[in-house]
C-alpha cells in the first residue's frame, strides 16, 4: 500500500469539503486545523485553487470558534480555513463567535448557552441532529 503524506491527505480532504459545499451538502466546511499559521498558510494557494475549481469561497480563520462539539485540543490555538458558498453561512458562523464572546463577557455562558451555540455550529456544518448529539455526548474534552 502506498504511503500518503499528511499534506496531501489534508489537501484531498479539503477538495472533498469544497465539493460538498458546492453541491449544497454542507453550508460550511472546516479544513483540518494546523498547529501554526505558517503551516496553514502553506495550504492557502491550494485552497484558493480548489475554491476557484468548485466556485466556493475561503475564509482564513486564525481564532476558531471553540465549542463542545469538538475536543478542545482539536481547535484551541490552531489555525484553520473555512469553505463556504453563501455569505449568509459565513455571517452566521461569525455571529456565533460574537454571541459566544458576548456571553462570556456577560458571565452568561451557561451550560444551556454552551450547548445551544455548539448545536447551532453543528447545524452550520450541516450535521444531522443525531450526529450533533453523538459528538456532544462523546466529547470528553470540553471547555
Task: Pin down the residues of each PLM region.
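A conserved ligand/cofactor-binding region detector
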Residues: 1-109, 120, 129-138
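An amphipathic, hydrophobic-aromatic interaction surface with interspersed Lys/Arg
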Residues: 115-122
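Binding-interface segments
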Residues: 141
Amino acid at each position: 500500500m502506498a504511503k500518503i503524506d499528511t499534506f496531501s491527505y489534508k489537501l484531498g480532504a479539503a477538495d472533498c469539503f469544497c465539493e460538498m459545499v458546492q453541491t449544497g451538502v454542507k453550508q460550511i466546511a472546516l479544513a483540518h486545523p494546523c498547529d501554526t499559521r505558517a503551516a496553514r498558510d502553506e495550504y492557502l494557494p491550494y485552497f484558493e485553487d480548489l475554491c476557484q475549481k468548485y466556485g466556493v469561497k475561503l475564509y482564513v480563520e486564525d481564532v476558531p470558534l471553540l465549542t463542545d462539539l469538538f475536543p478542545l485540543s482539536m481547535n484551541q490555538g490552531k489555525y484553520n480555513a473555512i469553505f463556504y458558498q453563501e455569505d449568509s453561512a459565513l455571517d452566521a458562523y461569525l455571529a456565533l463567535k460574537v454571541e459566544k464572546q458576548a456571553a462570556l463577557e456577560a458571565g452568561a455562558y451557561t451550560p444551556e448557552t454552551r450547548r445551544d451555540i455548539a448545536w447551532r455550529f453543528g447545524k452550520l456544518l450541516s450535521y444531522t441532529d443525531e450526529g450533533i448529539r453523538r459528538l456532544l455526548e462523546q466529547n470528553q474534552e470540553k471547555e
